[in-house]
Amino acid sequence: MELSSRSISAVTLFVAELDRSKRWYAEGLGLDKVFEDEHSAVFRFANTIVNLLVASEADELIAPAAVGRAGTGARSQLTIGVDDVPAACATLAQRGVALLNGPVDRPWGVRTAALTDPDGHIWELAQELP
C-alpha cells in the first residue's frame, strides 16, 4: 500500500479542558460537532475529522509514548487552505479568535496567518499567491 496516495482521515488533539476546547472549535472555527462523549468531541473538517481527547485519556492510545506537558512550546502546526486569508482572519476576529501573526506574504508564494487553540495547538491559514 502506498501511503502517499492516501489522505489524512483524522487528527487527534489532546486537550486539558474539553468544554473550553469544544467551544473554541465550534464557535471560533465554526466546525460541526459529529460525536461527543465524556472524554472526547469530534468535529468534521471537510474530509478530515478533528478529535479532541482529554489528555488524561490519551495514554492508552499512544503507549508507550507519553502525553507532552502543556506550555513547553509548539511542536506542530496544522494548515487550513483558504481562498482569502484576510477575509478568513476577519471572520475569525468576529468570532473572538485572536491571531498569533499575519496575514503575512511568505517568500515561498503563500499568504499566511497563524492562530492557536486554548491548548496551544497552532493552526495556520494559507492562501496561494498568484
Sequence positions of predicted segments:
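Conserved active-site tyrosine of GNAT-family acetyltransferases
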Residues: 21, 25-26, 92, 120
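Conserved beta-strand-loop-alpha-helix junction that forms the acyl-donor binding cleft
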Residues: 15-17
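Vicinal oxygen chelate
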Residues: 1-9, 32-80, 86-116, 127-130
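Short glycine-/small-residue motifs
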Residues: 122-125
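Major-groove DNA-recognition helix of helix-turn-helix-type DNA-binding domains
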Residues: 29
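Polyanion-binding surface elements
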Residues: 12
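Residue-level marker for well-ordered alpha-helical positions
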Residues: 19-20, 86
